[in-house]
Curated annotation (Swiss-Prot):
The lineage of its organism: Bacteria, Bacillati, Bacillota, Clostridia, Thermoanaerobacterales. PANTHER family: HISTIDINOL-PHOSPHATE AMINOTRANSFERASE, HISTIDINOL-PHOSPHATE AMINOTRANSFERASE 2. This is Histidinol-phosphate aminotransferase 2. PROSITE patterns: AA_TRANSFER_CLASS_2. Homodimer. Belongs to the class-II pyridoxal-phosphate-dependent aminotransferase family. Histidinol-phosphate aminotransferase subfamily. It comes from Carboxydothermus hydrogenoformans (strain ATCC BAA-161 / DSM 6008 / Z-2901).
Length: 362
């Protein structure tokens, strides 16, 4: 009954929701530091826009999201015809595979990385070529060597999730020189707003504007704080954007999401404050982790990987009992690591205190 390509696919398992932990463990006062969300919340301008829009949710949204596309186009100096929108950027990851992968075609991707690349390629009866990281970074040399006549698509997560490491401008330029122009290279920049603090971090939009078949994906879920509304966006060549617009569901970005995203783009000062606070939070966590005698991977995103020297599933469960939700590294093949979202000062301090207690008993 079910297509063969779907037989071994497993549903994506996100970070545990607060409500689920409350039900399972009967505890309250929970801090979710598992899903790389903006723990500072939404801007006042976004809150006001949502409040104003609520009275209009009885109408269908604009399927073409005209206002939002115009806003993004004006901000980034592209045409609306280059913009693709999704119910989160993960939907755009899927749309790209749907638009480009025929049975037997290949797509190249790093591993561990964002876990939706492989399933969507497999779903289309494509072949996912997963290239392991090298010292926690994308192995661009091996990825370039893996390109062949069957390669249609390359996914580059920059900064990479879960490691937080990033490709530099020079590294990306060298990689793109080695990849044939007919191969679509996707720069997944979900954490762009945080990574641009680094001088050698490449703005994918510059490469989109000068290299054919380059796609850039971004999201309102992270720095903008709209994870619950699900709105991702991207920049694609016009013919590819047209194909994606043809295959997407009619109203894939809902009305509240569109209005919130438009308002979010009007409050860049708030985003800068979130990025500044996150950077300060990371520095605090780095300092405390070193004091504990542990190691970490320096991150260009709003999360970091910490090497606990203990089985990650055990550390995860013990922190969970104490009301702190993190991500267990074993799901990424990093068994003695955990991934933690950078939170508010209170949340960061609580996490460090709870981690100290957990490691003392394990």
């Amino acid at each position: 009954m079910v297509r063969k390509a779907l037989e071994n696919l497993k549903p994506y398992v996100p970070g545990k929701p607060v409500e689920e932990v409350e039900r399972e463990l009967g505890i309250t006062n929970i801090d979710k530091l598992a899903s790389n969300e903006n723990l500072w919340g939404i801007s006042p301008k976004v809150a006001a826009a949502i409040k104003e829009a609520v009275d209009k949710v009885n109408y269908y949204p604009d399927g073409g999201a005209f206002r939002l596309k115009e806003k993004i186009a004006a901000k980034y100096g592209v045409t609306p015809d280059n913009i693709i929108l999704g119910n989160g950027s993960d939907e755009l990851v899927m749309f790209l595979a749907m638009a480009l992968i025929d049975p037997g075609d290949e797509a190249i991707m790093p591993v561990p990385s964002f876990p939706r690349y492989e399933p969507v390629v497999t779903m289309m009866n494509g072949i996912a070529r997963e290239i392991p990281l090298k010292e926690h970074r994308l192995d661009l040399k091996t990825m370039a060597e893996a390109v062949n006549e069957k390669t249609r698509l390359v996914y580059l997560c920059n900064p990479n999730n879960p490691t937080g490491t990033y490709i530099t401008k020079g590294e990306l330029e060298e990689f793109l020189e080695r990849v044939p122009e007919e191969v679509v290279v996707v720069l997944d920049e979900a954490y762009f707003e945080f990574a641009r603090l680094f001088n050698d971090y490449p703005d994918g939009l510059n490469f989109f504007k000068k290299r054919p078949n380059t796609v850039v994906l971004r999201t309102f879920s992270k720095a903008y704080g709209l994870a619950g509304l699900r709105v991702g966006y991207g920049f694609a060549p016009e013919n590819l954007a047209k194909a994606i617009n043809s295959l997407r569901p009619p109203f894939n970005v809902n009305f509240l999401a569109q209005m919130a995203a438009v308002a979010a783009l009007d409050d860049e000062e708030y985003v800068r404050e979130v990025v500044k606070n996150t950077d300060e939070g990371k520095k605090f966590l780095y300092q405390e982790i070193i004091r504990m005698g542990l190691s970490y991977i320096p991150s260009a995103a709003n999360f970091l990987m910490i090497k606990t020297e203990k089985p990650s599933a055990l550390v995860f469960r013990e922190l969970l009992k104490r009301g702190v939700i993190v991500r267990s590294g074993d799901i990424f093949g990093m068994d003695d690591w955990i991934r933690v979202t950078v939170g508010t000062p209170v949340q960061n301090a609580r996490f460090i205190n709870e981690l100290k207690m957990v490691l003392e008993i394990l």
